[in-house]
Structure formats: C-alpha cells, structure tokens
Amino acid sequence: EVRRFAKYILVNLNSHSSLIIHLGMSGRLKFYLKKNYQKEKHDHIVIEFDKFYIVFNDPRRFGMFFKLNNKELISFFSNYGLDLLVDKINISNVLEKFKKKSISLKQALLDQSIFVGLGNIYANEALFHCRLSPLRSTNSLNREDILKLIKSCRHVLKLSLKNGGSSINDYKSPDGTLGSFQSMFHVYQKTEVILKKRSFIVKKIIQNGRSTFFSPTLQK
C-alpha cells in the first residue's frame, strides 16, 4: 500500500514497517524496467524488484528516504497537524488555536503542527484565492475568514494535483512528465512587469526567510 501524509510518501512494506519518502526541493521517484535502466547523475537509491527498479533521484539532496516500524512511525508524525485534503476540519478548533497565536497568517499556513502539506507556493496562492493578507495576524481572523481560508487551501491543493503539481525547476512525475500548475499561478513569482495588463500589482516581501507574493490592494 502506498499513501501520502503531509509532504511524505508512505510505502507499507509489511504489517509492522513502512518506507518514508520526502522529495525535498528537487527529489523524484523514477521507475524503470530492468533492461532499460542506466544510472544517471544524482541517482542515490535504487530498489530492485523482479522486473523493474524504483530509483530515488535528488540533485539538491534535501530529500529523505528511510524506514520506520509502526511505533517509530506514530512518534515521527505525533506533532503534525491536520491534513487539509483528508481530515475533517473543526472550524471552531482552528479559530480557537488561531486566537491564541499572534503570528502572521502566512507563517501559520507553513506551520506543519497546524496544517500539513502546504508549502510556500500553495500558501501564497491560497491566500490570494481567499483574498487574505499574508501579513494578517492569526488572532485577527473570524470564523468566516477561517472558512474561506480552508476552502481556498483545499481548492489550490486539488487543482495542483489535478494538473500534476508545479514544475518550476526540477520536479517531474515518476513517468518523467512535467506538472502544469505553475502556468496557473496568480501571484507566486509573478513580477510587476508580467502583471502590467492586470488590474493589480503583486508585491514580494520576505517573511521568516521565505518569499511571499501577494496583492496589497486585493488581500486584506
């Protein structure tokens, strides 16, 4: 069985252990029939099966590939939050958690102890979709804001999955095809020059060491 949790791929090896894979910034899994495989640069792990290989390729080496037993697996994910695409979200609980914090909304979306699976690209796009500013403090949000936020996060994630993800630099699917969600970005890595024909301008700032793209006029 192969499943996903947060940004991890989990492969059940048997009833008591799993393989944990994180693609990092540039990692990808590749599948080859044995007769077709030729080792490429940055092929760090090769798993052999009867008729094919699964290869983990990672140029920038930010990925992870390791094995855990069931007890270790529970402990490893114990501090992770809710999965926006799988778990039922209790709006009241999220609102209460946000009211106790005074961090920026963008920072909260990247905090994997609150929600899992959102990276920088999708946090930027989701906030634009619901027209909420990344600079807003979490304790300033009301119930309606939370509802809009959750809906937008789910929308952006589902749309990205439908379009094969975002292939900006290195990402490819296991069959080698590129994702196309990057062509649908509204704000991420968009410059003022690109957006001159639009009715809004995108501003870039740095929050907690990460690039944030947003429209100051549309996102409040």
Go through the PLM ranges and name each one.
Residues 1-65, 159, 187-197, 203-204, ...:
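A cross-family signal for N-terminal binding/gating loops and helix N-caps
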Residues 4-5, 12-14, 80-82, 169-172:
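Short low-complexity stretches enriched in small and charged residues
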Residues 10, 97-220:
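Basic, nucleic-acid-binding surfaces and adjacent catalytic neighborhoods in DNA/RNA-processing proteins
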Residues 19-117, 122-129, 137, 144:
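Phosphate/anion-contacting hairpin/loop surfaces
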